[in-house]
Amino acid sequence: MNTIVLFLTLLILVSSCTSIVMKSSNSKERTYPVTPALNPLTGQHSLRQRQLIFCDECANACFRRKKPVRSCQRFICRCAIRDVGY
């Protein structure tokens, strides 16, 4: 009986801390990593072509999360905080 009460108390504390962390992380800007698909021809692409491929994959990653692209510069992908909505 005592173990059950202790377990439930611990569960409530962990869930409340998790909700607080999630709420604070939603207010900050999120940066999503984009991993390009492995391609043996990547070495043959110019820097500009690789950047275009990266930004295309960045846009796809943002749209999968229903977020517009905020920026794609120097191989850093940033999605906007707001959702895409009509």
Swiss-Prot record:
One of its GO terms (biological process) is killing of cells of another organism. It is found in: Secreted. It comes from the Eukaryota. GO terms for cellular component: extracellular region. Keywords: Antimicrobial, Disulfide bond, Fungicide, Plant defense, Secreted, Signal. The keyword Signal applies. Transmembrane segments: none annotated. This is Putative defensin-like protein 211. Disulfide bonds join C55-C72, C58-C77, C62-C79. Residues 1-19 form the signal peptide. Belongs to the DEFL family.
